[in-house]
Amino acid sequence: MDEPMNDAPGAQVKVTFTTNEADLQLPEEKRQLLVPADIRRYGLSRILNSDLMLDSGSIPFDFLVNGSFLRSSLEDYLNSEGLSLETNLTLQYVRSLIPPVFEASFEHDDWVSSVDALTATSPAGRWSGENFSRGQERILSASYDGLLRIWNASGEVLVTAPSASHGGHSASIKAAKFISSTQIASTGMDRSVRVWKYTDPGASGQAELKPTLELYGHRASVDSLEVHGPSKRILTASADGSVALWSASKSSSPEADASLLPNAHTSKRRKVASSVTTPQRGPLFLMQIHNAPATAAVFDPRDHTVGYSVSQDHTVKTLDLTTGSVVANLTLSHSLLSLCAIPRPNGAPLLAVGTSARHITLVDPRASAATTSVMTLRGHTNKVVALAANPENEYSLVSGSHDGTCRIWDLRSVRPASGGESEGGVGGNVSEPVYVFERESRQGKKKSVAGEGAKVFGVVWDRELGILSGGEDKKVQVNRGRDVVRE
């Protein structure tokens, strides 16, 4: 090992700049440079942005050294690694993720289980095409009080869903998504999937949320919901261990099993309790595929005929949604509680799976993959129940946990796992969060390691509105940072 370097006036370090970003490549002759030993990230970023280098203006950069972000001066880094002044450091420069700051929170009457965004760049906004207009950005929240609410970006409630007596859910809502700018799907503890027609405020200023379809097939709480707008397909996961595919269209939905309808075992008096009659239908497929509660199911980002599901039975399953069958099965070491698919340039996505063991496992679902677990993300202190991919790149995501925090992860920053850190405890890579933000409602209050009173239940990352999260504090919280998702 080289001798640690000594403090020396004017000491310099030879660095080699490299990047994987095609539009930010330096000419070969500019990649090696002598820089001051006491320089930090900001100084290195200024060098790269200078006229003699990239001439890129004011792009903030971070720098990776051996897979970890540089968080000190080069001098301090070399000393910490026991390296000498003569060491040639390779610095990989990447666009910075700017820390998201608290912007607003929207108060509810009960816990907020789920949140979604409707903007020009959100999935539902893109699927809506010309039917969506800028200035109509909306936030959808689902609550344990059994109600959906739609908000504008200023935090005003535009409309609240009807209660059970008027066609709404009869128990807590667990998940909700925009299918388009005019259609919403929701699921809940009442075992139902519901489709709603949303009418945005027009000249009258009156918004409307009207139930149009009730879907029955699950035999327990429906805890997860994913939608694909162009095909009007809905994918759900239930505590009964099943995963189901549905249509948001009445005409293409089969009849429901009569024994599963809410009126099947109730008295005549109870049957007429609702003043609204909504069509009731069943699933296109219902797959009884897990041996414990199914906690999440998602569509493949590039192929809606492929799905993925996870469960407390420790398994990740790849689903053929044209036949309703399982085509691949992976078994991990812990109960799996949340799931998101991170698109990759080619082939299958990377699956991020939140666990009861407080970490996130990145999984390659391809049967041909040499290693099932690609990376382990560590930092949460309680179970990880919500995940959302960055909408603008393929290397970052946000997680929500019962520890009361959301954490942002940058998959470009990795290190080899030490004993017991990776999924399965053997080999692999590990990453730590680059940013952590807590519930604003808990600021100034004594913090609980377990996150009591501040558990996060749902999170979504939108390019325009920022990171939206909901939780036990009965609030939707908005965190946004300038260029936080800049590609």
From Swiss-Prot:
A Gene Ontology cellular-component term: PeBoW complex
UniProt xrefs under PROSITE patterns: WD_REPEATS_1, WD_REPEATS_2, WD_REPEATS_REGION
GO BP field: maturation of 5.8S rRNA from tricistronic rRNA transcript (SSU-rRNA, 5.8S rRNA, LSU-rRNA); maturation of LSU-rRNA from tricistronic rRNA transcript (SSU-rRNA, 5.8S rRNA, LSU-rRNA)
GO molecular-function terms, A-Z: ribonucleoprotein complex binding
Domain of life: Eukaryota
Subcellular location: Nucleus, Nucleolus; Nucleus, Nucleoplasm
Region described as Disordered: spans on this chain: 253-277
Short name of any one Pfam family annotated for the protein: WD40
InterPro entries: G-protein_beta_WD-40_rep, NLE, WD40/YVTN_repeat-like_dom_sf, WD40_repeat_CS, WD40_repeat_dom_sf, WD40_rpt, WDR12/Ytm1
Keywords, alphabetical: Nucleus, Repeat, Ribosome biogenesis, rRNA processing, WD repeat
WD repeats: from-to residues: 122-161, 168-206, 217-256, 379-419, 451-487
Oligomeric and partner information: Component of the NOP7 complex, composed of ERB1, NOP7 and YTM1. The complex is held together by ERB1, which interacts with NOP7 via its N-terminal domain and with YTM1 via a high-affinity interaction between the seven-bladed beta-propeller domains of the 2 proteins. The NOP7 complex associates with the 66S pre-ribosome. Interacts (via UBL domain) with MDN1 (via VWFA/MIDAS domain).
Similarity annotation: Belongs to the WD repeat WDR12/YTM1 family.
Function statement: Component of the NOP7 complex, which is required for maturation of the 25S and 5.8S ribosomal RNAs and formation of the 60S ribosome.
Name of the molecule in the record: Ribosome biogenesis protein YTM1
